[in-house]
Design a protein with these regions (language model features):
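Helix-to-beta-strand junctions that scaffold the AdoMet/dcAdoMet cofactor pocket
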Residues: 151-153
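SAM-dependent methyltransferase catalytic-core segment centered on the flexible catalytic loop
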Residues: 45-146
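SAM-dependent nucleic-acid methyltransferase catalytic core
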Residues: 1-40, 45-52, 107, 111-114, ...
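Short alpha-helix
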Residues: 143, 172-185
Length: 219
């Protein structure tokens, strides 16, 4: 329906939009040096299941019949940002942390993943946050590498993003993404805070102050 609305709007004079269905880690169909501005909001590594957010629409359209169908239809294609996206039996944490994409932040990510792996032992759910964090930043590093290829020089990228603290362990998402962008070939980054998070509700799971805003990357 949204697609057809966009097609209809193209009959009006003005700039035209092209809708591509592609993986941000590959950007198939986008020419090299195509863009000089990218504005997007990637998944936040805060254990929100973006696949589950599509369940109502996909059920209505007949694309899924039960909750388990989301794994085959959606989850396996997502950047891991939820513990349900990573299976302890199928992810080799050591191999992920050793991947070349993580070299700019390997020590910091390894330390955080180690703390998460230790904390989960004392938690009932034993959620695989340590695997989620490692896989998330490896995949986001791949996104930055592809963005560098499809962006002109100079260009500007804006990520609306927020940090995270699974099990109360702080994950500095903004500087880590910024460092990955620099490693991919961009020149500089800055952050513009929009709001504070995890400060409103008294029944929140942890007391770590979080923020959300715009990560600006130039180069």
């Amino acid at each position: 329906m949204i697609y057809h609305d966009m097609k209809l709007s193209q009959t009006v004079k003005g700039p035209r939009a092209n809708l591509l269905e592609a993986d941000a880690r590959i950007c198939h169909g986008v020419p090299k040096g195509f863009a000089n501005l990218v504005v997007t909001s990637p998944p936040y590594p805060n254990n929100f299941d973006y696949a589950d957010a599509t369940r109502l629409e996909m059920s209505f359209m007949g694309e899924v019949k039960r909750w388990a169908d989301l794994q085959e239809k959606v989850r396996q294609y997502l950047i891991p940002s939820c513990s349900q996206h990573v299976n302890e039996k199928s992810v080799d944490l050591g191999a992920v942390l050793s991947s070349p994409e993580l070299s700019p932040i390997r020590q910091e990510v390894s330390e955080v993943c180690g703390r998460l792996a230790e904390v989960r032992k004392s938690r009932g759910g034993r959620k695989t946050y340590h695997l989620m964090v490692a896989c998330y930043f490896r995949d986001m590093a791949r996104v930055w590498e592809v963005l560098r290829a499809v962006c002109d020089s100079p260009s500007r990228v804006c990520f609306v993003i927020g940090d995270s603290a699974p099990y109360g362990v702080y994950v500095p998402v903004v500087p880590w993404l910024g460092e990955l962008a620099l490693a991919a070939g961009f020149k500089s980054y800055s952050f513009e805070k929009a709001r504070d998070r995890n400060v409103k509700w008294k029944n929140r799971k942890h007391r770590v102050p979080l923020l959300e805003g715009r990560l600006w990357v130039d180069g």
